């Protein structure tokens, strides 16, 4: 087992990783910026090191500072969490070159899956269903590009190969817009991601966002932990997630599970990962793979009983997967509401001092949060301050428990989006299950389609 893990992150995920390390008897090193001296996990870690000023570019994104902190504390491994450097192949490479273990996939695999064109090619080879589109990058030759778009059929979407999280994409509804849109996206992609390559795909008008959680040991063994539905989104940011995804064609589901597991083995994947799909008319279409732990991993843990973060640590220590596919049984239903420090109407960040914090409780309720009474939420980072997760024997029970949990949650002193969640878990269409990715924006009156 790993001896000492440096947690290269902050907030709720840093606390989540620390708890998993402690359960496995692994010593921990917490790193933090000057703005994060009050973080809960700092006092719980064996050691803590300040790695720079408040801006993430000078602290949590500073690779030399993180590696130096690992060296001075004698850490043997580094867990990146999510966000920041979690999917940065250069970070993974420098960690391994410096003699530490990176808790995650190899740099080569991160690069492969981080480039949307090479990722799509790898998935096609593994038999994972993909969205119809350009075979590789969209050619700069105008006639060829127009011919590809005609064959795919409008509307199409032009995406930056190095993009993600909803950035670097443009929907084109007819031929007259194609060339101009391609040029604009190329220019933006070059500036934002350092890679001007773009590709073209069929634009699915009303899909759902369904993803598959996998674990793979990089030694030829891989399993899936079922799927999640993350269709309730605002500006491509997930708001509520659930497992399993409701109302999915079972044959299509089992087929895509098998393909994802096979893909992990073929690319030599190591650690926890997520295959993200658009799901429309009973069919799955691969969009990207996240090569890290995800914010919404708890819903999969609740319905399978598998501790994903502990499994990541075991795999990183060189152990083979201890869980076989036949051991994974999906029982019941789980929901997760992301609690953000933001104005529920304008969605503007709401940093400040938490005067009083009370976490909900009761049967089947889990709260992953770094908040406590007296803690000050800094203005420098993502607004996520916690996740309320509920589990039930079925979806209705999980929803009933979530309604109770949100009513019990108290966060005084700052604004949060709790009221939005209270509304959503009582929304008739969401309660029925199976809303598409545009539903929330339409409900909020911000629909662009």
From Swiss-Prot:
Pfam families the UniProt entry points to: Biotin_carb_C (PF02785), Biotin_carb_N (PF00289), CPSase_L_D2 (PF02786)
Name assigned to this protein: Biotin carboxylase
Location of the Biotin carboxylation domain: 1-445
Reactions that this protein is recorded to catalyse: N(6)-biotinyl-L-lysyl-[protein] + hydrogencarbonate + ATP = N(6)-carboxybiotinyl-L-lysyl-[protein] + ADP + phosphate + H(+)
Catalytic residues, chain numbering: 292
Lineage top rank: taxon: Bacteria
Organism this protein belongs to: Pseudomonas aeruginosa (strain ATCC 15692 / DSM 22644 / CIP 104116 / JCM 14847 / LMG 12228 / 1C / PRS 101 / PAO1)
Gene3D superfamilies, per database record: 3.40.50.20, ATP-grasp fold, A domain, ATP-grasp fold, B domain
